[in-house]
């Protein structure tokens, strides 16, 4: 997790050149969810980070070698492939019944169990909210709660039906609670930022394709 007090370059150089060369390294920025104060990054951090992202573009275009790109951003091109290219290949046709991508099968891959024995879909949700509690050690899984978290598109049914980014949606149930209920308002707020990210990724994808990046490889 990259803190706001770093300049990115120090962390990048350490994990790319000083840390064990055969280890896989990924990085995320500090989450701003429920932050009391806004998360701010210095100009130096942004400059160093986006310079490495630009180098990842060059790597994707075979202009430089993989070892010349920071380990902290090597997954960037792969993320564009997964989030944009691979989904475009599906040629999904919207039918009478459809569902936005984004939600996982609650508790299947990353089940989180509290010390009290309560089940939650993963470690990213708010375990103080009953909206995410999907069972416990004594009673097992509450499948109706898991279904509710999977079918969060029901909260914004009309908007999802008309959304151009429905097949690129990454909005899961995490972060849309209000007390012990899932919030339609918070889901729409999350949707707005998700569409902005998708739009930027589409621009990157189209530019890289135009300059010869082979996402099929």
Model-derived segments and their meaning:
Residues 1-35:
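Radical SAM/AdoMet-radical enzyme domain recognition
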Residues 104-107:
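Short, small/polar residue-rich loop motifs at catalytic or cofactor-binding pockets
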Residues 98-100:
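Active-site rim elements
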Residues 116, 130, 155-217:
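Radical SAM enzyme core and accessory elements
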Residues 46-95, 123-170:
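C-terminal accessory region of radical SAM enzymes
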